[in-house]
């Protein structure tokens, strides 16, 4: 959890926002997945948001679903994902690592065991996409027991009560949803979200990162202008992977270019 606090402190000192890429662990293969993640970090990613492939992803658009299918085809399992996570942490001791996933995978070997494994491999935060705040108590209790930040999604229509709850129980960062629906670069993030960010700040919530539909530098700038601490981009990155599965060198070149441009947009 402290890694997020450190990161936001360092970025504030440099007057920068955070750029956080999302990829599926093991896509398109475990070895290539590690290459991709090293490339994202080298290109300027401030933190990582990583998915554990799941067969029935409710909040994911086709791009992220296909990434899960590629990982499954390469034989990726949750156990292999934890091995990849341990390797990332060993190579990159300070970068915040967040998981974005589904409840079934948390339940699989018991909630407590799941968070214990996260702590062992150096994961900092977990966001469970299909658990609404009002059902989150057992998850957030287990998370805090193991020093993992529970992350909550703040929807664009959140009322004052929900914002207070998220502020009081969330740690690490707050996932600010650009809009309702499924993920995807085509579905542009709707801005501005100033009123939500202001309220979250008033209630002392963890810094807000805006996600869903963030695919170009101008949107990163707009997120920061609305008061968010940074932006998360998933589908646009996973698309680059998808288009270049057969040409890994070109894939890494394009990922480097994309992350470099998105990170540049966080510098005022």
Swiss-Prot record:
Enzyme Commission numbers on file: 4.2.1.20
Name this protein carries in UniProt: Tryptophan synthase alpha chain
Annotated metabolic or biological route of this protein: Amino-acid biosynthesis; L-tryptophan biosynthesis; L-tryptophan from chorismate: step 5/5
Quaternary structure and interacting proteins, as annotated: Tetramer of two alpha and two beta chains.
Pfam family for this entry, one: Trp_syntA
Catalytic activity line of the entry: (1S,2R)-1-C-(indol-3-yl)glycerol 3-phosphate + L-serine = D-glyceraldehyde 3-phosphate + L-tryptophan + H2O
Gene Ontology terms for molecular function: tryptophan synthase activity
UniProt cross-references to CDD domains, sorted A to Z: Tryptophan_synthase_alpha
Matches recorded under PROSITE patterns: TRP_SYNTHASE_ALPHA
NCBIfam families: trpA
Family: Belongs to the TrpA family.
Source species, domain of life: Bacteria
InterPro entries in alphabetical order: Aldolase_TIM, RibuloseP-bd_barrel, Trp_synthase_alpha_AS, Trp_synthase_suA
SUPFAM superfamilies the UniProt entry points to: Ribulose-phoshate binding barrel (SSF51366)
CC per GO annotation: cytosol
Top-level taxonomy: Bacteria, Pseudomonadati, Pseudomonadota, Gammaproteobacteria, Enterobacterales
Alphabetized UniProt keyword annotations: Amino-acid biosynthesis, Aromatic amino acid biosynthesis, Lyase, Tryptophan biosynthesis
HAMAP family the record matches: Trp_synth_alpha (MF_00131)
Active site: 49 (proton acceptor), 60 (proton acceptor)
Function according to Swiss-Prot or TrEMBL: The alpha subunit is responsible for the aldol cleavage of indoleglycerol phosphate to indole and glyceraldehyde 3-phosphate.
């Amino acid at each position: 959890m402290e890694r997020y606090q450190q990161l936001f402190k360092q970025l504030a000192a440099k007057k920068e926002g955070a750029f956080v890429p999302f990829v599926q662990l093991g896509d398109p293969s475990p070895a290539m997945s590690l290459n991709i993640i090293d490339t994202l970090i080298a290109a300027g990613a401030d933190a990582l948001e990583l998915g554990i492939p799941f067969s029935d992803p409710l909040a994911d658009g086709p791009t992220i679903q296909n990434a899960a299918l590629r990982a499954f085809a390469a034989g990726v399992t949750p156990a292999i994902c934890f091995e990849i996570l341990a390797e990332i942490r060993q190579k990159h001791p300070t970068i915040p690592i967040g998981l974005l996933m589904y409840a079934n995978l948390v339940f699989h070997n018991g909630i407590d065991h799941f968070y214990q494994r996260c702590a062992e491999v150096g994961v900092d935060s977990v966001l469970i996409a299909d658990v609404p705040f009002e059902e989150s108590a057992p998850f957030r209790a287990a998370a805090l027991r193991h020093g993992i930040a529970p992350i909550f999604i703040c929807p664009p229509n959140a009322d004052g009560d929900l914002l207070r709850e998220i502020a009081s129980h969330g740690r690490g960062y707050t996932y600010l949803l650009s809009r309702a629906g499924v993920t995807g670069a085509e579905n542009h993030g709707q801005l501005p979200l100033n009123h939500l960010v202001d309220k979250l700040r008033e209630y002392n919530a963890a810094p807000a990162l805006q996600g869903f539909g963030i695919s170009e530098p101008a949107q990163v700038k707009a997120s920061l202008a609305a008061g968010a601490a940074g932006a998360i981009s998933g589908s646009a990155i996973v698309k680059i992977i998808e288009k270049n599965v057969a040409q890994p060198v070109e894939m890494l070149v394009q990922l480097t270019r994309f992350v470099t441009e998105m990170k540049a947009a966080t510098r005022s």
